[in-house]
């Protein structure tokens, strides 16, 4: 092998594959490749990420464990010895001499973006071009390198944001799937428990549960695969960006001769680099939680719920039969009794729940905002209200026409393929069960709050929210369940 080529190969061997400069504090990983300690840290350290997160080698993509990183002292010694030769990775050993004329390379052709000697600059192909000393264009190209670097940094920041977003979406998906899985099990158990009080079971519920869970598992796996692919592609793009940024930083520190080497190719590649957006993936669960016949059982626990006008906020209009409520145009002159809500559009039912099972349905129609559920009898009605079980509220609500939530932001947004026009509420006091159902969607399950002992008596909760122009004006109406099939 030619000695010159051999030395060049050695110089390249002691360069970090990530930053393309001499290895600094070289670290070896499981697969045997070595990188700068700082490069690996920047590539792998993800704020707030667990150490159990999957890592791969930037070169061969082999799985590795960060805890197995080890310093490569022998390689570090070789790097220091090669550094004494005052060479740089990518420079080669032919130095500053023109291969054609043997003269020093010190001129630069602006049109062709080429380094050349004086003899080349006077040749016919360049005599009409603008050829200047290399130093005259050094700052111009340093600035272009800076602009390209800023562009890549912005792309890197966007890639990081997208990566964080994909991790959050993955976490949200896992929570939704686990919540739906729990709901399926609970709802079938509830059906069996309630049915045994009425008549012996006549269905193979175990097979129905297994089928529903199998469908959920298939859907979860398909979506999870897509989410993981998105995340993997973003990580790969981040790694490419990291290497390109490191290359530009290193190039800007080179002597002018080596900074300008192939400069146009580097700039074109950097400036044209564009982050590929992740594939849009719906997180809407298609496997619903639906138990055939459950609503018929729940209706046997129908409660005669009526609104208590003494609790109604001053702009809420309660019908004479106390079955409907809507938001009025003006404040009514009502006594400020202790039971009345002072700040919020809330009215409560008049019947206390302290034992037993109770079920009622409320027509919400095409309203864009509403809230339904139960609350403690002794909640604060004059100050700020937090719709959380911690503060005595078990409520689901619709906001902005399509955002369904259970309580406050402590629970994820609910996925409802069919917007409910009628909502069923079921309370089993002794079982600590507060559940909601989409009657419009054949009684599919909406949400069940985690089961904790209730801290006293409960009251039905209603909030028609505000009227928004001509929208959200229809009343909330408690439905009669008598005589229904």
Swiss-Prot record:
Post-translation changes: Auto-ubiquitinated.
Keywords, sorted A to Z: Coiled coil, Cytoplasm, Metal-binding, Nucleus, Transferase, Ubl conjugation, Ubl conjugation pathway, Zinc, Zinc-finger
Domain B30.2/SPRY: 285-481
Tissue: Widely expressed. Expressed at high levels in prostate cancer cell lines. Up-regulation could be restricted to androgen-dependent cells.
Biological-process GO terms, alphabetical: innate immune response; protein autoubiquitination; regulation of androgen receptor signaling pathway; regulation of gene expression
Residues annotated to bind Zn(2+): 98, 101, 120, 126
Domain notes: The RING domain is essential for ubiquitin E3 ligase activity.
The protein, known as: E3 ubiquitin-protein ligase TRIM68
Source organism phylogeny: Eukaryota, Metazoa, Chordata, Craniata, Vertebrata
